[in-house]
Amino acid sequence: MNAAITATAKYLPDGILSNLDLERMLDTNDEWIRTRTGISERRILRDPEKATSYICGEVARQLLEKRGMKAEELDLIIVATMTPDMLFPSTACLVQDIIGAGNAWAFDLNAACSGFLFALNTGSRFIESGAHKKVMVIGADKMSSVIDYTDRSTAILFGDGGGGVILEPATTEGCGVLDNRMYCDGTSGKDHLLMKGGGSLHPATHQTVDDHLHYIYQDGRMVFKSAVTSMANVAVEIMERNGLTAENVSWLVPHQANQRIISATAERMGISSDKFISNVARYGNTTAGTIPICLAELDEENKLHPGSNLVLCSFGAGYTWGGVYVKWQ
């Protein structure tokens, strides 16, 4: 039994932080940012009283409405995020409360930018095993809460937002989440993309705050090299494992980190520009939110049809990376 995606949804906050705004804050300019990243603006959840659970709640309500489902019908909620409201309880538990899904158990999963694919794979297993019938998977991050807006190497990249899907048993033979490849390399990744403060190694103190340890640190050059290679490799691997070609892949749905990485992945796959989705110019990198936001936009624009072949791929901190093959139901 395969797991099929039966609903999609996204939420982007109204606040916009443009490249021109960043010009006034940092030693940077619009042309420099667009040339290196492809990003023109990003969304920001400005209300300090609203956190990642708010984004997830908005996504969850839409998913239920689109599917015509009651919250009580859900068996499981998985939230992929690296910016939870709190260390505990999990953001997924907060979402369960927000939507009133009293019969669902819930947990968070943190694989940074790869989080949604890891969560999608995990949720699919519960459907495939027959343990559950209705699983909600959400990827969301309030990245503005962990960005140092005096550091142009990271401030230009990230935005807030999220998206999600509902998984149910496929009703069409040969459709659903059909294959995946997930990878991790803690040896290479542990020093190049991280946030040092706030965990048990460096608990929050005046010193950790003064030292900016509660913000993302990224060695941009090293991360870029690894991301370009890993995302392209896993996307090609998914194609080869499943007999897919550039002609019969309907959509490449890549993590939206950087337009150059997206384009390099498509080029390795032989995919033309009309077969991959890119919204990084409008939203920046929403981390765990990028791929489900892309899926929701494709769905809203009626670009997903029964039998469409989708290759999803991502790369994130850890390092973590992966690819998923979905045949749309």
From Swiss-Prot:
Protein name per UniProt: Beta-ketoacyl-[acyl-carrier-protein] synthase III
Main enzyme class: transferase
EC number: 2.3.1.180
Catalytic reaction equation(s): malonyl-[ACP] + acetyl-CoA + H(+) = 3-oxobutanoyl-[ACP] + CO2 + CoA
Family stated for the protein in its record: Belongs to the thiolase-like superfamily. FabH family.
Annotated source species: Chlorobium phaeovibrioides (strain DSM 265 / 1930) (Prosthecochloris vibrioformis (strain DSM 265))
PANTHER family (UniProt xref): 3-OXOACYL-[ACYL-CARRIER-PROTEIN] SYNTHASE 3, BETA-KETOACYL-[ACYL-CARRIER-PROTEIN] SYNTHASE III
Phylogenetic classification of the source organism: Bacteria, Pseudomonadati, Chlorobiota, Chlorobiia, Chlorobiales
CC annotations in GO: cytoplasm
Residue span of region ACP-binding: 256-260
